[in-house]
Amino acid sequence: MQREIHISTGADTHTLHSSGMPDPHVFQFYHRAMDILEAAGIDYAVGGAYALAVHTGIVRHTKDFDVFLKKESLPDALAAFEREGLRTHVTHPHWIAKAFSPDGELFVDLIYSSGNGICRVDDEWLASAVPGEVLGRPAPLCAAEEILWSKSFIQERERFDGADVAHLLLKRGEKLNWDRLLARFGGNALVLFSHLVLFRFIYPSEPSPAPPRVYDFLLEQFRSQPVSKEKVCRGTLLSWSQYLIDVEEWGYADPRLRPRGNFTADQIETWTRAEK
């Protein structure tokens, strides 16, 4: 069941599709992509820049359009786009595919997991989507909790989404379902804790976005975490590139590998080679 969302950010959906609006062919293609998915009966939620704009008021128009769906729905989604004459490509089999506009200039990202394999799109992700508008068209939007969860792990040299996380905490912190968010992070809750610490540094004049019990829980996690008996570097969950030396030369285990993670060695090698 979808829940209503009321956001006071100084930029509502009307502002989003009347100020800095992209070229008509851009949003026409995005509208068409959503029409195709809905006609095929595929559950999805819009994320990326357009969902972030609704949740925070930060407007960024990009040439890609992020649609989140379950991996089980991907074959039907690709087939639906191809029936409409759109070229598709499974960019990285473990988390993302694309559907391209006829001229190849625009594309839709079909996302069903995260690059690190942690943030998989599941029934809860789609059931928690909130009703909204994307460039004047009704559309389900990824909930703030899922956006924050997935963005918290993006800490590459060339892309760090910490500012997006801080802005989500600033604009949506009081309304977040913190129990659900903690459950999403699970054993990686210290990543959330690190962003809450950064928030306190970034916004010293703002109240804490999380209730005291959340800080108590995370502080206890921090204090009680024992030193791992296994020599492991969890940095690869934050950046595919910046911790390669740890797992390739310094003898640290890679937590992305099974059974600890979701990847085989071949999958990691393929992913790393493609990103390089």
Where are these regions (language model features)?
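Short, flexible active-site-adjacent loop segments at beta-strand->alpha-helix junctions, enriched
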Residues: 50, 73, 114-116, 138, ...
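Active-site nucleotide-donor binding segment shared across nucleotidyl transfer reactions
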Residues: 31-65, 69-78, 143, 251-276
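Anion (oxyanion) recognition and catalysis
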Residues: 38, 82, 133
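Conserved catalytic core of two-metal-ion nucleotidyltransferases
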Residues: 82-122
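Short, hinge-like loop/turn segments at secondary-structure boundaries
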Residues: 62-64, 86, 107-108, 127
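Helical scaffold of the NTase/Pol beta-like nucleotidyltransferase catalytic core
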Residues: 1-46
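Catalytic cores of NTP-dependent nucleotidyl/adenyl transfer enzymes across multiple folds
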Residues: 4-9, 13, 120-276
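Short aromatic/hydrophobic-glycine micro-motifs
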Residues: 42, 85-87, 174
